[in-house]
Structure formats: structure tokens, C-alpha cells
Amino acid sequence: MNPTEIFNLLVTFKGHKTSSAGEELLGIEEIELTLQDEKNIFDIKETEFQNVVLIESGSDPLVVAKELADASTTVISKIVPIELVIRTRPDLIAEKVITISKDKIKSGETFVVRGDIRGREYIKSKEKFLSSISQEITEKLGVEMEKNSPDWVIQIEVVGENTGLSVLKPENIIKKF
């Protein structure tokens, strides 16, 4: 994967992270079948991480995520629309999260920071990292963190040297089981 890969959706599949069973191939096929109509121009990119693919879509990622959520699929597990892709550097991630959060999260609203770290050479401790981002947002934007029912979810998806960032309403991060 190249630094600063272009993508606006991250999709994970059910299955073991170390398994090379057919979940990833089946998942890619499910995405292709769901998005095959002429209005969707997209590119599915495999990653070095098992059961994780990136999608670059010419359509609104929120709309594409909903299409995938509504489709009858068997292995798609999580669908995350991505607003911004940057290189994986903790200081840059914090800076960009603040930038995109301040335009969305208003005074009196709440947030939670969630994410997955794939590739530990960039960020050693997921818990420490997400906690430090939460603290920085609270201090710089003057908004409260709420884990259980936040108004906004700040989603940080580290995929090796690339990180996808989003500030989304909770219902826009789709988990299928």
C-alpha cells in the first residue's frame, strides 16, 4: 500500500485475522455485486491486513455504506465511511481530528473516539492513543466525552501507514452481524 492511499470506505469481514479462508474473497464479491450498477464507480483495494479492504468510491460514502448495509451479505462485518486519509503519525492524526471535529461537534454535544489500529509499528497502545485524542478534543473544543450514547463518533482507522478519519453520527458506522 502506498503512503496516503486514496479511499473513502473501510470494510471488514467476519473471520479470523490470521485465517486465509475465503471470507475476504467472498466479501469482495459481495461488495462488487452490491455496487455493480452504473451509478457506482468504485475501486476495491486489498490491504496487508486479513479481512480488511479499502474502497475508493466516486459516490457519497454515506450512501454507499447504506447500500452495503441494506444488501443481503454474509461476511461483511463493519462498514466505515472515511472523510480524510492521512499518513499514520500520532501528532498528525491528533491535529486533523481536531480540524474536522471543530466544524461538526457543537457546544453541548458529546463525542466518543473509537478506532482500530492495524500495524503496531506506528502506534503501540490503542487505549493510550485513543484516550489522548479524547483528552485533546475535550480540552481544545470544550465538549464532553460520552462513551455510551454520544452525539458524534470520531472514528480513527489505522491501516499500516495510512489512517482514515471520520466524524460521524453513530448510525453512520455500520456493524452487521
Regions found by a protein language model. Give the residues of each.
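SAM-dependent transferase fold signal centered on methyltransferase-like domains
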Residues: M1-F177
